UniProtKB/Swiss-Prot annotation:
Name by which UniProt lists this protein: Serine/threonine-protein phosphatase 4 regulatory subunit 3
Swiss-Prot/TrEMBL GO biological process terms: DNA damage response
Residue stretches of biased makeup (Polar residues): 721-730
Domain WH1 residues, every copy: 1-100
Entries under InterPro entries matching the protein: ARM-like (IPR011989), ARM-type_fold (IPR016024), EVH1_PP4R3 (IPR055236), P4R3-like_central_dom (IPR006887), PH-like_dom_sf (IPR011993), PP4R3-like (IPR051137)
Biased composition, class Acidic residues, residue ranges: 788-804
Positions with biased composition (Low complexity): 736-756
Disulfide bridge partners, by residue number: none
A Gene Ontology term for the protein's cellular component: protein phosphatase 4 complex
Quaternary structure and partners: Serine/threonine-protein phosphatase 4 (PP4) occurs in different assemblies of the catalytic and one or more regulatory subunits.
GO molecular function, one term: protein phosphatase activator activity
Annotated segments matching region Disordered: 718-818
Similarity annotation: Belongs to the SMEK family.
Length: 818
C-alpha cells in the first residue's frame, strides 16, 4: 500500500469546545501491526516526531468539511481534526478512510454520529430515503413538520441532510422566501424560519457552504428575522447593509481574503445575534458551525500574516506624521481588533502572529502612538500593549532596554505607560488599574528569563530603577511634602493607593534594588504621611507598605526606621483613631504584635525607649505591655548573661518532656474545678499563666465606657507630644541600669520561674519569664489580643492585697503574652 503524504495541521477539541493546534506535519495511511489495521499517521515537519497515530476504525464516524477538513471522534470526549493545505490531499485521505470502512467517498459522513436502538435502526435502514415534499407555498407546513420530526434521530437527520443537499432545496426555499415576503405571508414566513433553523441543526458542512455563500447568506439572515415567538420581525439585514460598514483602512488586494472576512463577520453575526440561544442539546448540534467560524479565523490571520505589503503599509501609515487623525484612529482600531482576533487562536498560531507583528515593528509604532494627543488613539494603543505584555513580557522588556540607550527617559515606552496611568481621567481609574497590572507583570521576577550569558532580572530591574521608578513615584513624592497629604481627594487617593500597591509588590520581590531606592529617597517617611489621609483605604495601604518592610526583618530597614523615628506617624494615627475598633486599629496593633512575637530586638527597644509614655495606658490588648516585657528581658540578659544561659537550659529541659506528660498535665488542668481553689490560689499550667473566667466575661459595655473616659487623656498625651524633633522625641524615656518591673507585674511573691509551676522567681526579677513561657491561657485555651479590664471592686481588692504584699487572686494575675 503506497503512502500518500500531505501537509496538515492536527487539532483536538478541548473542554471549552475550542480547537487546540497540536502541530503541523505530513499525513500518511498504512498498516500498523500494533493496531492490526490501517491507520492515519502524522509526523511533524520540524523533527519527524509522531503527532498522530490513529487506527481507521470501521465504526468511527468521519466527516469531511469545507473540502480541506476531516473531523472524527475517537472517544466520548476526544474529537480530532486534520486541516489539509491542499484539497487533493484531503480527497486522497478521505478515499482511504472510505475504502477501509466500505463507504462511498462522495458522502461527507461515513457513520451515524449517535447509536440508536436496534428497532429504530432496523426501521430506518429498511425504509427508503426521505422524500421531501415539493417546495411550494401550500406545502411549507408539511416540510416544517418533517424537519422537526427528523431532528431527534441521527439517521433521519442524515437522510434529511442528504435530501436537502442533493435536491438543491436551500435555493428553492430562499426563492419561496422572497415570494412570501412580497405577499406579506406571515404564516409562510414563520414556517420558513422553522425550516431554516432546523437545517442549521443538521450540523452539516456542505449545507453551511451553500447557506453562507455570497448569493445566499443575506437571504438566510432574512429568513431568520421572522421568529414566530416575536411580535415583530427583526431588522438584521437592515443593520448589516446600512449600519455595519466594512472599512478597508489598508487596501486588501487579495479578493479571497476580502470575501473570507465578509463571510466570517456575517456568520459570527448569525451565531451571536440571529440564531436563538441554543439549548444544551442544540449546542452540541451546532458544533460544525463553531468549527466553521474557527477555521475561517485561522485562515484570515494566516493570510494577513503572509501579506507583507499589507502589514508594512499598516505600520508605515500608523507612524507617519502626515497621516490625519481620523485615518490614524481607524488604523489603530483595526490593529486592536486584529490583536483581539488573535486571542481566539491556539498558542502555536498566536506565537506566529505576535512574532510577525514584532518583526514588523509594533513596539516602536506603539511608542509613537502613545506620545500623541488623541485620547482615543492612546487608549486603543494601551489595549494593544496589554495584548503584547500578556503574550510575551520578555519581548517588551528587551525592547525598552534597547531603546533606553537611544532615547530620553521622557519618551521611553514604559514611562509613557506610567504617565497615562497617572493622567487617567476616569473617576474610577479603570485604565490606571489595567496599566498598573501590566507594570506588575513587567517587573515580576517570576516570569523573567535567566540564561548562561545574561540574567534578565538583573538587567531589567537595574534599568527600571534607573529610568522609570522616579516617574512612578513622582505623584507620591509631590503629595507628601508636608505632615499630611497635599491633595486628599478620592481620585488622587485611588492613584496613590495603586502606586503603593506596586511599591509593596517591589518590596516583596526586588530585594536590594527597592531597598536602596527606599533608603536613599526616604520613601517610607513619605509613604507614612498618607496615614493622615481621610481615606481609610489609602492609610491602610501605607501601613501595609511599612508592614511588608518590617516583615523582611532586614536590619538595614530597621536601622533606617529607627534613625528617622518612622514609628511616630504610625503611633499618631493609632492615637488619633481613639477607641474606634476598625481596620486601622487592627492593622497597627498587628504590626506591633509582629515585632513582639518575632522578637525583633532592635525595633522592640526603639519602640519602648521612645514611645512607651504614649502606649502605656493601652490596656485592652497585651501587645504593648508584652513589648515592654520583651524589652526588660533583653536588658536583663544584657546585665546578667549567666541568668540567660540558665533560662536556656531550663527551656530546653521543658521541651524534652514527652507528649504523654503534657497530655496528663492538660487533663489534670481541665479536671480541676474552679470552686476547689482557695482564695489567692493560682492554677498554672507548666508553661503558661492562667486567667479566670471573670476576666473574660466582664461586660463589653463597661469596657467601652472606660475607653471613652480615657479618650480625653489619650488626646491630651498626643497634644503634649512633639513629633517634630527627631533627635529628641518627646516619648523617649531614660532607663537606668537597674532592672525595671513591668507595669503589669505582680509582687515578687507572686512571680513564677519558667522552670516549674508555683516556684518563686529569682530575687528582684519581678514577673519575668522566658519568651517561650508567657502566653496567657484560660481553661478554654489561648486568649486573643483583647484583654478586658477587671471591675472596680476587684481593683479595690487588688489595691488592698498589694499593700499587704500577698499573692494576687487569679483574676489579677499578671497578663503576659509572648
Amino acid at each position: 500500500m503506497t503512502d500518500t503524504r500531505r501537509r496538515v495541521k492536527v487539532y483536538t477539541l478541548n473542554e471549552d469546545r475550542q480547537w487546540d493546534d497540536r502541530g503541523t506535519g505530513h499525513v500518511s495511511s498504512g498498516y500498523v501491526e500494533r493496531f492490526k489495521g490501517t491507520s492515519l499517521l502524522v509526523r511533524a515537519e520540524s523533527d519527524g516526531s509522531l503527532l498522530l497515530e490513529s487506527k481507521i476504525n470501521p465504526n468511527t464516524a468521519y466527516q469531511k468539511q469545507q473540502d480541506t477538513l476531516i473531523v472524527w471522534s475517537e472517544a466520548e470526549n476526544y474529537d480530532l481534526a486534520l486541516s489539509f493545505q491542499e484539497k487533493a490531499g484531503c480527497d486522497e485521505i478521505w478515499e482511504k478512510i472510505c475504502q477501509v470502512q466500505g463507504k462511498d467517498p462522495s458522502v461527507d459522513i461515513t457513520q451515524d454520529v449517535v447509536d440508536e436502538s436496534e428497532d429504530e435502526r432496523f426501521d430506518d435502514m429498511s425504509s427508503p430515503g426521505l422524500e421531501l415534499p415539493p417546495c411550494e407555498l401550500n406545502r411549507l407546513e408539511d416540510l416544517a413538520e418533517l424537519v422537526a420530526s427528523s431532528l431527534p434521530s441521527p439517521l433521519r437527520r442524515e437522510k434529511l441532510a442528504l435530501a436537502v443537499e442533493n435536491e438543491g432545496y436551500i435555493r428553492k426555499l430562499l426563492d419561496l422566501f422572497h415570494v412570501c415576503e412580497d405577499l406579506e405571508n406571515r404564516e409562510g414566513l414563520h414556517h420558513i424560519y422553522e425550516i431554516i433553523k432546523g437545517i442549521f441543526l443538521l450540523n452539516r458542512t456542505a449545507l453551511f457552504e451553500v447557506m453562507f455563500s455570497d448569493e445566499c447568506i443575506m437571504d438566510v439572515i432574512g429568513c431568520l428575522e421572522f421568529d414566530p415567538a416575536l411580535p415583530q420581525p427583526r431588522r438584521h439585514r437592515e443593520f448589516l447593509t446600512k449600519t455595519a460598514h466594512f472599512k478597508e483602512v489598508i487596501p486588501i488586494s487579495d479578493p479571497e481574503l476580502r470575501q473570507k472576512i465578509h463571510q466570517t463577520y456575517r456568520v459570527q453575526y448569525i451565531q451571536d445575534m440571529v440564531l436563538p440561544t441554543p439549548s444544551v442539546f442544540e449546542e452540541n448540534m451546532l458544533s460544525t458551525l463553531h468549527s466553521f467560524i474557527f477555521f475561517n479565523k485561522v485562515e484570515i490571520v494566516g493570510m494577513l500574516q503572509d501579506d507583507e505589503k499589507f502589514l508594512t503599509d499598516l505600520f508605515a501609515q500608523l507612524t507617519d506624521e502626515a497621516t490625519d487623525d481620523d485615518k490614524r484612529h481607524e488604523l489603530v482600531n483595526f490593529l486592536k481588533e486584529f490583536c483581539a482576533f488573535s486571542q481566539t487562536l491556539q498558542p502555536q498560531n498566536r506565537d506566529a502572529f505576535f512574532k510577525t507583528l514584532s518583526n514588523m515593528g509594533i513596539l516602536p509604532a506603539l511608542e509613537v502612538i502613545l506620545g500623541m494627543d488623541d485620547v482615543q488613539v492612546r487608549a486603543a494603543a494601551t489595549d494593544i500593549f496589554s495584548y503584547l505584555v500578556e503574550y510575551n513580557p520578555s519581548m517588551v522588556r528587551e525592547f525598552v532596554m534597547q531603546e533606553s540607550q537611544q532615547n530620553d527617559d521622557d519618551i521611553l515606552l514604559i514611562n509613557l505607560i506610567i504617565e497615562h496611568m497617572i493622567c487617567d481621567t476616569d473617576p474610577e481609574l479603570g485604565g490606571a488599574v489595567q496599566l498598573i497590572s501590566l507594570l506588575r507583570t513587567l517587573v515580576d521576577p517570576e516570569n523573567m528569563l535567566a540564561t548562561a550569558n545574561k540574567t534578565e532580572k538583573t538587567e531589567f530591574l537595574s534599568f527600571f530603577y534607573k529610568h522609570c521608578m522616579h516617574v512612578l513615584s513622582a505623584p507620591l513624592l509631590a503629595n507628601t511634602t508636608e505632615d499630611k497629604p497635599s491633595k486628599d481627594d478620592f481620585q488622587t487617593s485611588q492613584l496613590l493607593a495603586l502606586i503603593l500597591e506596586l511599591l509593596t509588590f517591589c518590596v516583596e520581590h526586588h530585594t536590594y534594588h527597592i531597598k536602596n531606592y527606599i533608603i536613599n529617597k526616604d520613601i517610607l517617611r513619605r509613604v507614612l504621611v498618607l496615614t493622615a489621609s481621610k481615606h481609610a483605604f489609602l492609610a491602610l495601604c501605607a501601613l501595609r507598605f511599612m508592614r511588608r518592610i518590617i516583615g523582611l526583618k532586614d536590619e538595614f530597614y530597621n536601622r533606617y526606621i529607627m534613625r528617622n523615628f518612622l514609628f511616630e506617624p504610625v503611633i499618631k494615627a493609632f492615637l488619633n483613631n481613639g477607641s474606634r475598633y476598625n481596620l486601622m486599629n487592627s492593622a497597627i496593633i498587628e504590626m506591633f504584635e509582629y515585632v513582639r512575637v518575632e522578637d525583633v530586638k532592635s525595633l522592640t527597644a526603639h519602640i519602648v525607649e521612645n514611645y512607651w509614655k504614649a502606649l502605656e495606658d493601652v490596656d485592652y490588648v497585651q501587645t504593648f505591655k508584652g513589648l515592654k516585657l520583651r524589652y526588660e528581658q533583653q536588658r536583663e540578659r544584657q546585665d546578667n548573661p549567666k541568668l540567660d544561659s540558665m533560662r536556656s537550659i531550663l527551656r530546653n529541659h521543658r521541651f524534652r518532656r514527652d507528649a504523654r506528660t503534657l497530655e496528663d498535665e492538660e487533663e489534670m488542668w481541665f479536671n480541676t474545678d474552679e470552686d476547689d481553689l482557695e482564695d489567692g490560689e493560682t492554677v498554672v499550667r507548666t508553661s503558661d499563666k492562667i486567667k479566670t473566667e471573670e476576666d473574660l466575661m466582664e461586660p463589653i459595655s463597661k469596657f467601652m465606657e472606660r475607653k471613652k473616659l480615657k479618650e480625653p487623656e489619650d488626646k491630651e498625651i498626643l497634644a503634649k507630644s512633639s513629633f517634630s524633633g527627631r533627635q529628641n522625641p518627646s516619648f523617649k524615656l531614660a532607663f537606668s541600669g537597674s532592672t525595671k518591673t513591668s507595669l503589669s507585674s505582680p509582687p515578687p511573691s507572686a512571680s513564677l520561674s519558667p522552670g516549674s509551676p508555683g516556684s518563686p522567681g529569682s530575687p528582684g526579677s519581678g514577673a519575668r519569664s522566658s519568651p517561650s513561657n508567657t502566653s496567657v491561657t484560660t481553661k478554654g485555651g489561648l486568649v486573643g489580643l483583647v484583654d478586658y479590664p477587671d471591675d472596680d471592686e476587684e481593683e479595690e481588692d487588688d489595691d488592698d492585697e498589694e499593700s499587704k504584699e500577698e499573692p494576687l487572686p487569679p483574676s489579677k494575675k499578671s497578663r503576659l503574652s509572648s
